[in-house]
Amino acid sequence: MSKQILYQDDARKALEKGMDILTEAVSVTLGPKGRNVVLEKKFGAPQIVNDGVTIAKEISLEDHIENTGVALIRQAASKTNDVAGDGTTTATVLASAIVKQGMRNVAAGSNPMAIKKGIEKATNFVVSKIAEYAKPVEDTTAIVQVASISSGNDAEVGKMIADAIDRVGREGVISLEEGKSTSTSLEITEGMQFEKGFISPYFVTDLDRMEVLQENPFILFTDKKITLVQQELVPLLEQIAKTSKPLLIIAEDIEKEALATIVVNKLRGILNVVAVRAPGFGDRRKSLLEDMSILTGGQVITEDAGFSLDTVQLDMLGKARRVVVTKDSTTIIADGHEATVKSRCEQIKRQIETSDSLYEREKLQERLAKLSGGVAVIKVGAATETEMKDKKLRLEDAINATKAAIEEGIVPGGGSTNVHISGELFVWAKNNLFEDELIGALIVQRALTYPLRRIAFNAGDNGAVVVEKVKTNDFCIGYDASNGKIVNMYDAGIIDPAKVARSALQNATSIAAMVLTTECIVVDKLEA
């Protein structure tokens, strides 16, 4: 296919146009008075969402060059979502603001590389200030506030997430399930999560979220490497195919040929199966597999116990209520083995007491926390499927934001932290930077006010006026868009996780700086 090549200003303007389209679609959702966006789906009902990264993933333009701009800014949103789980709309608005101002300066003759350096120095300054101002999360109130804001100002959801964290611990696992009623409820179940994901993306059942979801699966635990499918696995796969239930395989590893056979079975619809590598190494791996087998009422297929894969029967497999596997983690939600789990926990406690090694004690405590903490399951209730999807996205944001707040602390929300720091950045840049580097830093300084401007605009207020009002007040004072008043953000419960604020800025400036230093674009030429 022949290529189309654009240079200099033409290249940057085409990228900017694509960015503008995406930013406008995403920024209408910003703030408590942000609106929803309807997404048409190839299959099923349209989806109504208020989530920046979900909207960004759906936008694809006819013009190849503009679409490149969309893809670049989408990257800022996706990366922020991966790191912090929230703040995707803010990242998009910031990236767009930096690009727009940077374009003007580059067109006026500024050096793009020097501007990029200035942007990077300004970002480092702001990130250090966010860390300096961040308050650690010490009580349940702050958790409720963060979760409420991220779920679209839903205080009930905030309380539920705080309750879940209270019951499974700050490192605990919170899982989302579709409920059977119209109300959302919380349930604590036996379960555990470990940091290993699916071996092959062909196992994925939910392509939107890139995860494997299995209801009531069998689970095969083995510390062996699976190599010979015909002898080792086929007898078991045939038994499971008759039950029509899914299968989760947790093994040391699976050889390419064996993996190919399992994948083919999955793709042909013969068996809903997913394979995961076992966590840990050596003896620790065996112990973790034993923990999981006790949790699910199964047995570890190991030669030490005289078992081999070709003789496995269904009653030797574990059973779970639900399994969720992503590219990085596996969550097993089990039921009804309380007595055996309790005695296993007692056994681990005794090992902790008798162990001399600090490292070993740490690992044993980790195992105990995984096994005894359980999993908090939030059953999402809604009247329609469309509402259900929207609620799940909001709850996911709220859970991620809460965990981010626990990690790095909280700062005043609603865009006010960025506005206050922009004043300090202006003074610092004037004293420390010169020429085009100063221009780069001042671009970031002005861009920092854009999220608040947009929140005010979405609430029907004048963004520039609101920004000036906030600037002249103390750091904890900001704009409450739900009632249009200037308030103490901590007292009003309008707070953001510092990690979200930091990630949004870092990813936005990274993408924007790359766009500003672009001098040429090569894309496929559309055939007439």
Curated annotation (Swiss-Prot):
Gene3D superfamilies, per database record: GroEL, GroEL-like equatorial domain, TCP-1-like chaperonin intermediate domain
Pfam families: Cpn60_TCP1 (PF00118)
Keywords: ATP-binding, Chaperone, Chloroplast, Isomerase, Nucleotide-binding, Plastid
GO cellular component: chloroplast
Catalytic activity as recorded in UniProt: ATP + H2O + a folded polypeptide = ADP + phosphate + an unfolded polypeptide
Protein's UniProt keywords contain ATP-binding: yes
Alphabetical list of InterPro entries matching this protein: Chaperonin_Cpn60_CS, Cpn60/GroEL, Cpn60/GroEL/TCP-1, GroEL-like_apical_dom_sf, GROEL-like_equatorial_sf, TCP-1-like_intermed_sf
Disulfide bond residue pairs: none
Enzyme's top EC category: isomerase
Top-level division of the source organism's lineage: Eukaryota
E.C. no: 5.6.1.7
Residues bound to ATP: 29-32, 86-90, 414, 496
BP terms from Gene Ontology: protein refolding
An example Gene Ontology molecular-function term: isomerase activity
Location of this chain's protein in the cell: Plastid, Chloroplast
Family designation: Belongs to the chaperonin (HSP60) family.
SUBUNIT field: Forms a cylinder of 14 subunits composed of two heptameric rings stacked back-to-back. Interacts with the co-chaperonin GroES.
HAMAP family cross-referenced by the UniProt entry: CH60
Chain's role: Together with its co-chaperonin GroES, plays an essential role in assisting protein folding. The GroEL-GroES system forms a nano-cage that allows encapsulation of the non-native substrate proteins and provides a physical environment optimized to promote and accelerate protein folding.
Protein name from the UniProt record: Chaperonin GroEL, chloroplastic
